[in-house]
Amino acid sequence: MSDFNITVAEYQEFHDYLEESCGIVLGPNRQYLVTSRLHMLLRHAAIDTLSHLMERLRSGDSRLRIDVIDAMTTNETSWFRDTVPFEVLDRVILEDLYARKVNDATFWSAACSSGQEVYSMSMVIEEFMSRRAMALRNSTILATDISTKMLNQARSAVYGEAQLDRGLSAKRRTVHFEPFESGFRVKDKVRSRVRFKEQNLQQEIATLGKFDCIFCRNVL
């Protein structure tokens, strides 16, 4: 795909398709991003132009649609990213739930990506429980994402050294992870309160239920 230029009309059609179908909004003049993200995918699919890709997508090729969304989804994430939201979760939200004697609180990570955010949330809950005599012991976290590739990574809960080095303290690594095959896996006590679901936020979300706290930091 790098062998040709994307026309303005082709880019606009692809831009509109992504926004309408899954809520991904590309900025203006991001042809280079489309080229870099889709190059290998289109080569393997024997697609040589963006117009050809759109023909396939409009024809209802669901496998190709999933692959395109996976390729175009931004997956930059880290453990306890920006710190403050997790401090607020710990010191404000969980304290409030504890004061109201809520043991079955529900949380939602609306775009969980490869799992770092949702497992960070679960670690905070686990640590809070250890300080508060098992308060919130029946709490659950729903983790959703539009990318099946990212959901599979998150479900596995297995991360390499380089991934663990992004925002995870040595103490939390020791407490919440265990060696697994060629990497490290989140321990069951943290994994067990999390359930995963593929979800397009452009579609109906009322059926997901009500939540005491929603993290949607990876959505924007």
PLM features: residue spans?
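Conserved SAM-binding loop of SAM-dependent methyltransferases across substrates and taxa
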Residues: S114-M134
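Short, well-ordered alpha-helices that flank and scaffold nucleotide-derived cofactor binding pockets
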Residues: R91, E95, M123-S130, S156
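Conserved class I S-adenosyl-L-methionine
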Residues: V102-S120, T140-L142
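Conserved AdoMet
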Residues: M1-W108
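Alpha-helical elements of the RecA-like P-loop NTPase motor core of helicases
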Residues: E87, Y119, N152
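Extended basic-aromatic, gly/pro-enriched interface segments that bind polyanionic ligands
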Residues: A110, R132-F215, V219-L220
